[in-house]
Amino acid sequence: MGTVHGDGGEDGPSWTRAAELLQDAAPITVQEGASAMTIHVHWEPGDPGTPPHRHSGPAFGYVTKGAVRFELEGEPERVVEAGGTFWEPGGDAIHYQDGNALADETTEFVVTMMCAPGKPMLELVEEEELKQRAHLRAPRPTA
């Protein structure tokens, strides 16, 4: 995606080539007093992942193995393969899917989340709210 420390060229110092930009998300909002946590998630083959939920702050993920089926409210479902990144703004947005897109391999990802003070890192969304917000979900793929 690009360099992080400027363009030192092929002959420049190694520190100008050592870091590769994988994701640049904007705008993000982090509440005063927020904390950050980084977790490693391991899904067995075909695991659908966490039920629809939201995070209290932004989350930034990197898939280390396999492929994640990712769906955020208002965005179409997509598959993020190993080496790919994802992010979500947190707050009110519903995260519908984060499961393993592969039926025969494990999937793993690392995610760093900013947690609003006094709030849980993850909150499941009740069925009633999902129905009320159905119009905000992107159209589902058809088989």
What are these regions (language model features)?
Residues 42-44, 55-70, 109:
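Short, conserved beta-strand element in jelly-roll/cupin
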